[in-house]
């Protein structure tokens, strides 16, 4: 065969068309084979895919193609997480309807994804903004409402003043909106909530069953759920300082053992006692208002400067009524965590210590390390928050912190205040219910109606969907549904009188909390086909960024439980396996400095390297510009690489191969032109090897060799096959690439010999077998090239429909073993020797090792113990 360079511009569209025509990747739910569901987190249709998408979807595609070849019935769908603020922002900025903007972007991104050659079942595609999708989400909402998993209440919310919408606590990052970056305010609004807290303990306990999730993600969820065992303590208010009608303050604490270190109580700005104090004191009122303007997330409160104001209220210590403590309003106490009140032990908590030092409050050390000296131990600038031994704590002195906890809990449970136990053991959770109301248009309408006579009335299921109106305007911020002249005005389904639709829409995280279930039967007239959902769920391998560890993944776990409670699925967990891939990062380039800095795109510069020093020069002027740090690709810093440009220049397979090969998949991959060119050279080399030998091999039946000069060829291929199987199973793509490179090197000379007409029939059969294994190993990563090579060898049918090769057991056995050599129990050397060597041969070889000779220093060994194929121990 005349060898030409592999041309991806010709090959890739051709094979994509063949796969499409043959419907290779469309999944049949009735297929009886063992199922495998692989899913990458579906994208938001922002307009263009980026290299991070390419890496994410390439990883999922390798898994899908590999499992398909291994004989599984693979489900590998794709859709669009399509609701959200960016579409409304585009509507305001460009005067285009959110739907038009969204579907146009979907069209562009779908074309890009198809150009990557992903083995996706596009027949199951949907966007969450499709009425056909969100009508089922409304159905689920009504089922949850009926089951008591949805409720409505007046609540303090995080208000984003730029996006004009409510944010969940998890969406407030360092006091700012996660999308807009605006400083978040607190407002009182009536909101809809999902009762995720009903499942707090289950969500926590089940983390132990998710052994195919990264430990880091499980720990993040565990901390977010935040289970704590503590004590609710009722503190008596000193009568002369008590507001009218108030007699006590209830505090929840996880450290009742430190009660004798207490020097103050702190309450939230919205605590009833704080409101009473604010009504009487303008300074306190102003301070409470300042607290309300701060973010409500725990992360924001932990980083903010600790501030407080004395209310004038005093309480009696529960273990010593003669001891009075001041009550402060503090900016680090949340009304919706615990009871909205805490006691401060400065010696045992850094936050409390900082607060006490600031306001001149006592600091008494009450816990010291086990090996501490009670006479000299004290707390300086750093609190001691560990376990240890009690000091300065009267009847608790000398007890461990655990013993002290139980003694205090028992004593206060037996004591009474107003005929009620003064203390009560309690389990608390940091997790809050999920507020889903958003004051925006481009989201799933909440299917309820407000009637002056009947109250809140669910929309009857027969009247679903509640469709978004198309005729809306975005000429001002806020929710267009509130301003719509007709849409919100309806008749009450119960009494028939005039009523109003709910104009809030659902948080977009609702849309992504069950989409993986809908993929199992997207044509179903109900939210799910339980039979299909129960067959496919949980997702066997889910792939996405660790930034979703809490929000999306926790919400999805809740939703699956809620859907189980309402009869839609049998599964408890949505995702059996989770993989969080690293980002694609790139150098940054800029000119100027400070406020005048201008970022420059990689496509606009060339890199020059002289004597090991790199310079970046503008293509247009030759001006040298600064090479900055390596960062996540972002439009703002222009360090992005357009996948379309890479595909046009090198082909999709090169892009896929590079992002899979350059670093471990859980780590960031640094994008470099040199790396891409290296991946491209590999694809050309592989094509050259196969195509040059194709004529000589096309009529040869593949068969591994069992002896002779071809044996080493078959051993190399089959050992690589076994190793790469393990790599693919464990998502070690970069290791698989390294082994494939080694196999290509091992096959280069044999392929060249065969191409030159050399080698007997056994040799050619072994080379053909090895070549086919090589092609099948690269197929999940470079599928177009693999199909082209497969066809070049004269194979009929699509490689995408071909089963995975099997390695020969005798061919993968290593002939040599490496034995550790110990002298008196300490490892001194290693011996590489034939697996079949007898004990005498092993003994003689060990004694001939230089390391052993040096260690023995002329001594004769007393005994040499050989454990066959395991270890050698020399006793002297």
UniProtKB/Swiss-Prot annotation:
It catalyses: tRNA(Leu) + L-leucine + ATP = L-leucyl-tRNA(Leu) + AMP + diphosphate. Residues 1-20 are annotated as: Disordered. Pfam families: Anticodon_1 (PF08264), tRNA-synt_1 (PF00133), tRNA-synt_1_2 (PF13603), tRNA-synt_1g (PF09334). InterPro entries: aa-tRNA-synth_I_CS, aa-tRNA-synth_Ia, Leu-tRNA-ligase, Leu_tRNA-synth_edit, M/V/L/I-tRNA-synth_anticd-bd, Methionyl/Leucyl_tRNA_Synth, Rossmann-like_a/b/a_fold, tRNAsynth_Ia_anticodon-bd. GO terms for molecular function: aminoacyl-tRNA deacylase activity; ATP binding; leucine-tRNA ligase activity. ATP binds at residue 635. Its EC number is 6.1.1.4. The keyword Ligase applies. A motif ('HIGH' region) lies at residues 43-53. Keywords: Aminoacyl-tRNA synthetase, ATP-binding, Cytoplasm, Ligase, Nucleotide-binding, Protein biosynthesis. It is an enzyme of class 6 (ligase). Its main location: cytoplasm. A motif ('KMSKS' region) lies at residues 632-636. It is found in: Cytoplasm. One of its GO terms (cellular component) is cytosol. GO terms for biological process: leucyl-tRNA aminoacylation. Belongs to the class-I aminoacyl-tRNA synthetase family. NCBIfam families: leuS_bact (TIGR00396). This is Leucine--tRNA ligase. It comes from Rhizobium leguminosarum bv. trifolii (strain WSM2304). The gene is leuS.
